[in-house]
Design a protein with these regions (language model features):
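A conserved short beta-strand
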Residues: 92-104
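Short beta-strand/loop motif that positions the catalytic acidic residue
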Residues: 115, 121-123
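Conserved alpha/beta-hydrolase "acid-adjacent" motif
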Residues: 128-133
Length: 171
């Protein structure tokens, strides 16, 4: 998830539940502690967020129950930037990346160019500043990718039916 959010947010738990209903295992966790999340600068420390995501990935890979499973990342806002940076570092070990209202630009041009996992960038059609950032990131990526705008949706996809469209696309 992204800045100012948590694993307990209704949007995050809803998407995780829908993915689980469709047979996709999920691990929903916070990239920052509560204290760290209070610091605005830390919320945008993409290198730190990426390190935390890579640590969680290593933990999953070390468990005999999960080590052989395909792994994908689903990130929102700054969490999407961390997902893309981590996917670039993990190369072919990540099967897919989904960004919901993400800030892929914060991953950096080099990382975006190194992502090999198929990537889905989902942006609200009324999230004007973020649309352009996703279009620019999309142009820098060399992997199989798709940018989808959800008509009428703002950054948090709070409008009726918009989050449901996100989960259908992600699954």
């Amino acid at each position: 998830h992204g800045s100012g959010s948590s694993r307990f947010s209704p949007r995050n738990t809803y998407v995780a539940e829908v993915l689980q209903e469709r047979g996709i295992g999920t691990l929903l966790f916070d990239l920052l502690t509560r204290e760290e999340d209070q610091d605005y600068a830390t919320r945008f420390d993409i290198d730190l967020l990426t390190q935390r995501l890579l640590a969680a990935t290593a933990w999953l890979r070390s468990d005999p129950k999960t080590q052989a499973l395909s792994l994908g990342y689903f990130g929102a806002s700054t969490g999407a930037a961390a997902a893309l940076q981590a996917a670039a570092k993990m190369e072919k070990n990540i099967s897919a990346v989904v960004s919901r209202g993400g800030r892929p630009d914060l991953a950096g041009a080099v990382a975006l160019g190194r992502v090999t996992a198929p990537t889905l960038l989902i942006v609200g059609g009324a999230d004007y500043g973020v649309i352009e950032l996703n279009q620019q990131a999309d142009a820098l990526m060399n992997c199989e990718k798709r940018l989808i705008l959800i008509p009428g949706a703002t950054h948090l996809f709070e409008e009726p039916g918009t989050l449901e469209r996100v989960e259908r696309l992600a699954a």
